[in-house]
Structure formats: C-alpha cells, structure tokens
Amino acid sequence: MEFISQFLEMLLAERALSKNSILSYKRDLLDFHNYLAKQKLSELNITTDNIRNWVEYLAENSLQARSINRKISTIKSYYEFLISENHTNLNPLLNIDLPKYQNKLPEILSIDDIKSLLEYCSQDISPEGARLNAMIHLLYASGLRVSELVSLKLSDILSNKVSREVKKIFSVLGKGNKERIIVINEPAINSLVKYLVVRDNFVNKTKPKNLIYLFPSSAAAGYMTRQNFAILLKSAALYAGLNPEHISPHVLRHSFASHLLEGGADLRVIQELLGHADISTTQIYTHLQTNHLKKALLHHPLSKN
C-alpha cells in the first residue's frame, strides 16, 4: 500500500491529472491489490502468467473490455513507476495483449428530444426546477463535462458580482488542468439569470465551502454531485416522455457535439469546445453523421427494393 500511495503522489505532482483521474487510478490499484491478497501473491514477485490469470478473472466477472484495458494500462504504469524507483526490475505486463473491443458510437438525443426535455424543465417554476433547467441548458449549450458543470464557481460565470450579469464567454479547467474557452447562447444565459434569483435556496451558510459554487449543496465537496445531477436528469427525461435509460449528462455532451457538426461546425472547433486532446476522439461524431445519412437514404425510392 505504501508504494501505491507513492505512485498516486507522483501522478498528482508530475502529471497534473484531475481529481477524478487520480481516484480512477486509485480504485484500479486497490482492486488489483485486493486480488493479489486473495491469491496470496506479492506485487513484487508476480509473473506474466499471474497477470493473465487476473485478466481472465476480470473477464469472468463480466467486466467490459474497455474497462479491462484501462486497468491493464493503470497497472502497467504502476510497474513502470516501481522499476524507476528500484523496487523491482520487471514489468509483468509488458507482454500482455489488450482485449479487443468495438468502439461503440456515442448515444445522442434528437433535436426534438432536446426540445421536449427543455420544454418540460422550463415549466417547473420551483427553485429545484430553475436549477435543473439552468444545468441542462448550460450543459447542452456548452458541451461541458459533467464534472466541470457541477464544480463551476459563481465567479466563473459572473462578469459583475453586484449586478449578477452572466458572461457569454468564460473559461474552465478541464482534464489535465487544461484551460479552455466556453461560449454559451442566450437561452442558457436566460436560464442562469432565472436560477440565480433562487440560488440562495441551496446555500448552506453553516458550510462556507459551498458559497463559492454556482450549484451549491450540502455534499462534502460543496457542490451538487455528478450522481445527483444524473438522477435529476433521468427523472426530468421520464416526465418529458423520454426513455431515461437513453439519457445521461454524457449523452447531452454527445448531443451538443453531434448537433454542432450537423449544423456545419468545423471539427477542429468542436474539438476545442469539448477539450479533446486528440482530434481522433472528436472524429467519432463524423461516423454518427454518416449513420444518419445512411438511414436517410433508406427513404429514397430506389432503396426500398
């Protein structure tokens, strides 16, 4: 466990990873540590065969190939660290093949579905309704990651604290502490203005930590949790007549990108707005558009034979 703590400290100090990324590394490492303990194995004396058995164990427990790949990558990095610190001289994962998986196309909502969702939310005039309406408008207008959305600070979006004027353009720190520019539209601004009127309903003045956040709560972090927002979003989808199983904060982010591309936005611009380090990550949305075109062609008279 001591080596795991040292590795996590190194990640935090040298790679500038986000808190969520560090937690993901920690979970993978602790799961691996627990597996070794059950098998009565030492992390400094395991073999490639031991690792293959571990990978088989993960697959047998219905873990998806993508998740297994992430765990392998985490443990491989961990052993590279152990080697660099002279704790061992062998990386047992060097000859481990990554399981293959199909790169599933992201799920998106249609523009009509988005309109139905926003229409339902705009009808709820309670403070909770105003908050959810603002969060959904902001997420769909900006393509923010849900972790970025919930942790926004009041100062991030206000150009004037006294008049509470909302900025149209602001910046966020994304993955790897990389700053990027966010631009939002008038409907999102209007929803935020309405929400700010009732925001104090959610402020717990006995916990000063939550005062600085746009969406404050009594949660330990001081702002609404990702999980709570996802639950509220699915509930709103149900009342809006949508299937809650097909909606999540990430689906709204995907919908933002796909609808921009459909409207003629440049792929490089979408990459910047989403905060993707690699254009290949953004290119998946072009495959979505290709699928839509193929479906549209099915309505051609010569396609019906």
UniProtKB/Swiss-Prot annotation:
Residues 104-298 form the Tyr recombinase domain. Residues 1-83 form the Core-binding (CB) domain. HAMAP family: Recomb_XerC_XerD (MF_01808), Recomb_XerD (MF_01807). The gene is xerD. Keywords: Cell cycle, Cell division, Chromosome partition, Cytoplasm, DNA integration, DNA recombination, DNA-binding. Pfam families: Phage_int_SAM_1 (PF02899), Phage_integrase (PF00589). One of its GO terms (molecular function) is DNA binding. This is Tyrosine recombinase XerD. It comes from Rickettsia bellii (strain RML369-C). Forms a cyclic heterotetrameric complex composed of two molecules of XerC and two molecules of XerD. PANTHER family: PHAGE INTEGRASE-RELATED, TYROSINE RECOMBINASE XERC. GO terms for cellular component: cytoplasm. GO terms for biological process: cell division; chromosome segregation; DNA transposition. It is found in: Cytoplasm. Site-specific tyrosine recombinase, which acts by catalyzing the cutting and rejoining of the recombining DNA molecules. The XerC-XerD complex is essential to convert dimers of the bacterial chromosome into monomers to permit their segregation at cell division. It also contributes to the segregational stability of plasmids. The active site is at 145, 175, 250, 253, 276, 285 (o-(3'-phospho-dna)-tyrosine intermediate). It comes from the Bacteria. Belongs to the 'phage' integrase family. XerD subfamily.
